UniProtKB/Swiss-Prot annotation:
Could be a nuclease involved in processing of the 5'-end of pre-16S rRNA. Its main location: cytoplasm. InterPro entries: RNaseH-like_sf, YqgF, YqgF/RNaseH-like_dom, YqgF/RNaseH-like_dom_sf. One of its GO terms (cellular component) is cytosol. GO terms for biological process: rRNA 5'-end processing. The keyword Heme does not apply. This is Putative pre-16S rRNA nuclease. It is found in: Cytoplasm.
Length: 155
């Protein structure tokens, strides 16, 4: 099921499983996972997109390998919280995951996650070239941590 309400998402997620997070891009997807206590997000990897079938297959494989029970996907909303054109594509992708794998997915506003990731990497001394190669997985980590913070204040 696709969730936009953190209360509903919290009720639907297995308590002893990790949560996987995706920061969707046209060419690549940043991936992060929570720990099993669902308190801490950790950047995992960047997946370079191929086609829908391969993308879904790869994401499902690492979802299972990392003992995940639910998923968060970043949604790029405008400043006034209206959806961007890219949101429609992300929602369609999320619905394909749900239909194929029966996973609960929460859509988290991803506003400024890439800017925060880039800035964080810059102040740690990582070069712009290297930063561009890893900022999507850091963005996924930021998006997931926002969700974890939300659901842990509800618990």
């Amino acid at each position: 099921m696709l969730h936009r309400n953190p209360d509903e998402f919290l009720k639907s997620i297995p308590k002893d499983k990790r949560i996987m997070c995706l920061d969707m891009g046209e060419k690549q997807i940043g991936i992060a996972f929570s720990d099993k206590t669902q308190l801490i997000a950790t950047a995992h990897s960047i997946y370079h997109r191929k086609n829908m079938s391969k993308d879904l297959g790869y994401l499902h494989r690492i979802f299972k390998e990392n003992e995940s029970g639910s998923m968060v996907i970043g949604l790029p909303l405008k400043m006034d919280e209206q959806e961007t054109k890219w949101c429609k594509t992300i929602i369609q992708f999320a619905n394909k995951i749900i239909k194929k794998y029966k996973v609960n997915i929460y859509l988290q506003d991803e506003s400024f996650s890439t800017s925060i990731a880039t800035h964080t990497l810059k102040i740690t001394g990582i070069s712009i070239t290297k930063s561009k190669k890893i900022d999507d997985k850091i963005s996924a980590c930021i998006i997931l941590q926002r969700t974890l913070d939300k659901i842990n204040t509800i618990k």
